Amino acid sequence: MGPLHHAVAGPAGGRPVLLSPGLGGAAGYFAPQMAALTARFRVVTYDHRGTGRSPGRLAPDHDVPAMARDARAVLDAAGIERADVVGHALGGLIALQMALDAPDRVGRVVVINGWDALDPATRRCFAARRAILAGGGPEAFVRAQAIFLYPAAWLSAQAERVEADEAQALAHFPGAETVLTRIAALEGFAIADRLGAIGHETLVMAARDDVLVPYTRSERLAAALPNARLALAPEGGHAHSVTRPEAFNRALLDFLDRD
């Protein structure tokens, strides 16, 4: 398998931070964080295998451990031995897997709307998204995505922006087979019995109105990790790093800047 597309930004002497996006897989998800992070950190972004600028057919059994190996390969390509890892949803699962598989490569961990085992509510959402993709194709899947990501009031206020984002997502849709394989990887991730082995400083972030991943799942994750703290936003949805970037960035920087 070929190398993944990645980019490095920020001061050469800054502490490295790897950003790993969610199901969509595109590095651009973290655009609202880049200015704040690159002012002081050496930030590595990348597109997951099979998405964005990292094309390629996924093996049917492509899973989170394979994605964690990809993330380590990105660090290798960037010449970075150890980095803090910030991951949204699937990216957060990758961060946890990296901490388990290669603990010396990982500094601090940030898990945004993630989990240690799939929640029944999340399973229901994924079943609905698979049905939308099967019945309506890529356009229906992409248009429905915003309902799972954003609060209704924000979605209403940002309708033009969302439509532009949807056009971009549809133009770069990775294909149904890739999307379904990545959803299966999310559904198969289960490390509840291994959380005690993750001693890294960890920030678990969530929004109370996330309809895709209940915030209670983040509460349980933070409670089970030996060295974790929880940051709950009152609102913002599954993509609260996008809908409430100022508050999100403050909480993120407060954690990453700790001595």
UniProtKB/Swiss-Prot annotation:
Family label: Belongs to the AB hydrolase superfamily. Hydrolase RutD family.
Keyword Transferase in annotation: no
BP-aspect Gene Ontology terms: acylglycerol catabolic process; nitrogen utilization; uracil catabolic process
Function: Involved in pyrimidine catabolism. May facilitate the hydrolysis of carbamate, a reaction that can also occur spontaneously.
InterPro entries named among the record's database cross-references: AB_hydrolase_1, AB_hydrolase_fold, AB_hydrolase_sf, Epox_hydrolase-like, Pyrimidine_utilisation_RutD
Name of the top EC class for this enzyme: hydrolase
EC code(s) of this entry: 3.5.1.-
Catalytic activity as recorded in UniProt: carbamate + 2 H(+) = NH4(+) + CO2
GO molecular function term, any single one: hydrolase activity, acting on carbon-nitrogen (but not peptide) bonds, in linear amides
NCBIfam families assigned: RutD
Domain of life: Bacteria
Keywords: Hydrolase
GO cellular component terms given for this protein: membrane
AB hydrolase-1 domain segment(s): 16-118
Protein name: Putative carbamate hydrolase RutD
Pfam families linked: Abhydrolase_1
